[in-house]
Amino acid sequence: MAKEKFVRSKPHLNVGTIGHIDHGKTTLTAAITKYLSFFGRADYTPYEQIDKAPEEKERGITINISHIEYETETRHYAHIDCPGHADYIKNMITGAAQMDGAILVVAATDGPMPQTREHVLLARQVNVPAMIVFINKTDMVDDEELIDLVEMEVRELLNKYEFPGDDLPVVRGSALKAVEGPDDPNDPVYAPIKELLDTMDSYFPEPQRETDKPFLMPVEDVFSITGRGTVVTGRIERGVIRPGDEVEIIGMSYDIKKTVVTSVEMFRKILDEGLAGDNVGCLLRGIDKDEVERGQVLAKPGSITPHTTFKAQVYVLKKEEGGRHTPFQKGYKPQFFIRTADVTGELIDFPAGVEMVMPGDNVEMTIKLIYPVAIEEGMRFAIREGGRTVGAGVVTAIVE
């Protein structure tokens, strides 16, 4: 049996439910699949099945995460749902499943809670482009004014973290009522689910395709081919490369070298173009083997620059996850794995009032590398010490 081909007739978006524990994230995910299953656009996935999220490893960190697929009339969605709070933090920081849009679930019975805030902060730090609010469990609150109050609080919270809290869409309903509803898509219990899906289709922006972004390829290996020159190999992270394109070699120093890719090859075949996701070899004009090394990147001129100092949101592994057993302070110098670069860096600053960072913490810090690497906001990295992963981070701002 051949694998079913993924039909690209509709734009594809990655979305996810976020919010406080027991506010109904997983029930809402189940309700979406139930409603769409009436139209043959999803397989109904009940709560128990989503909740048994399989383990995945991303940058040496184990995360429990469920991937649910469904489509509306106009779009195809991959929806992620995590069973535990720590899984959400780890997922958002490692980028195991990046989100083009998030559905913030808030229970009308509770209003915004500590994890609601933490997820909103993380969504801001990792640049989730858009957010829709689903106020859940409205059937358990008799007074409409109390729900209005919850909506006001959520909008204020979103404003505080620089989301358009006054303008973004808010849908009210009961995910459980929909999950327990009859087999009739026109039953009123499904109205909020339909409203949510219509809102996702209209409000979540279509993501830019990886091939439309400026070319970037981390250098994995360098070979010298007698009579032909220097070939660098790697997996194209984004964009397109064609023979004759000019590229910059960036990283390891502030000195940026320009060269031209004279040939693009994959499995010893010459390509007209290499695309995001392809593992290729690029032949570089006029570059010696010792002028380029693993850890650098090839990139479209002017699209990325080398830096040493940046701010990052970091998740520090617990000892049960294979991380450190003890806290660390400013001045700690682990290895940073940034794309293919492996570089020593120092933690030079923590937030005010933070003296030390404990295993299991999620904290913003400033990092200074011993030499410059191609860095940009939103980029993910791993922190390792003595051959084991001790943390994962995402760049939130470039300092210098």
From Swiss-Prot:
Residues 174-176 are annotated as: G5. Its EC number is 3.6.5.3. The keyword Hydrolase applies. Signal peptide: none annotated. InterPro entries: EF-Tu_GTP-bd, EF-Tu_GTPase, EFTu-like_2, EFTU_2, G_TR_CS, P-loop_NTPase, Small_GTP-bd, T_Tr_GTP-bd_dom. Residues 19-26 are annotated as: G1. Residues 60-64 are annotated as: G2. One of its GO terms (molecular function) is translation elongation factor activity. The keyword Magnesium applies. Residues 10-208 form the tr-type G domain. Coiled coil: none annotated. GTP hydrolase that promotes the GTP-dependent binding of aminoacyl-tRNA to the A-site of ribosomes during protein biosynthesis. PANTHER family: ELONGATION FACTOR TU, MITOCHONDRIAL, ELONGATION FACTOR TU-RELATED. Monomer. This is Elongation factor Tu. The lineage of its organism: Bacteria, Thermotogati, Thermotogota, Thermotogae, Thermotogales. The gene is tuf.
